[in-house]
Amino acid sequence: MQDCGGLRLVELPAALVAASPTLFVQHAMATQIALASLPDVSELLRNLLDGPHPAVAGRLAGGFRAIGRQGLADEILGAMRGAGYAVNEVNPIEKPLHALLPGGRAESPCVQRLRLMWAGMREQVVAAFPPASGAPKDIDALVKDVEARYVTDAYHSLSIEGYRVTAALIEKVRDGGWNPDGDDKDRSARDAMAARGYLETHKLVKEDLVRVIKGQNAGTVFRQALLRWVQALFRTSVQAGILKPTDLAGYRNDQVFIRGALHVPPSKEAVRECMPVLFELLEAEAQPQVRAVLGHFLFAYIHPCMDGNGRLARFLMNLMLVPAGHVWTVIPVEGRNEYMSALEQASSLANIAPLASFISELAEAQAEGPLAPPR
């Protein structure tokens, strides 16, 4: 047993030895991730030989071989047979998940789960979206269209996060009428600070859209842009003394929870393992709608920042959609419950279809005409 945050947990090698054959069928992803997470079989062999457990050894050897870890399978068989036990290899895995172990190296369970979710969900996303029209040829016209949708986008994105904003406030901030340096009331206005941060980040996203349209890899652009986006989103809060500059230095340094959700984001340590893999997945994915939906979902799933994750996820979504020929897509606050439910379905039940359909329908509808401006 080991203590993990106050919980007494069975160590992984012992848990694998105790796992029944049906567990590999009923919880295929979890058991295969467990097999893929072991760096070697030293502790596993101690448990197998101590039993002894020759039948279990045959099952685990078959499981390792099924996910591509032939070396570990052979080690188990060799050690057990060398100790005098008759071992028959049996594969307990009905459907190997082949996104595991790129290059044959062990990775953390969180990283394995990201890869498996991406591989398992992408075809559903492709099926939910109509074909994109391709990179826009008139970049100036595209930027003007994005700017024309800005007030509506900022209103809905900020409202989803609980800020009390109006079109008038967003326009005042955009037009330079908000003066935190010369007006104490403006300096302390939380909603206006959020609107200012959104404006500054939106400007950066527009620049990054152009980089992608001109041929740069969208995943690489996002990798390079994320920290700048975070700093722009919260710079005003630092200037007001609400946040310290070190709060914007990188990923979160504490655990976060999502109100009303079953899903608990990964630990702060796991965030540092997961984010490079998310960037890799975005960089390697050819389909923009997959980058948009799964990028949005997995960014929210990881929740790498202490705040602003929803806004950043929606910026990421549009960074992937717009250069492919889709319009800048606004998620309306009126659809918040459906939106949050779709994210929860994806996070807790591995069902991406509701989120893919939700975003696809919004993108199609807004291609016909933008959402009505907020009153």
Language model features by range: what are they?
Residues 1-375:
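FIC/Doc superfamily catalytic core
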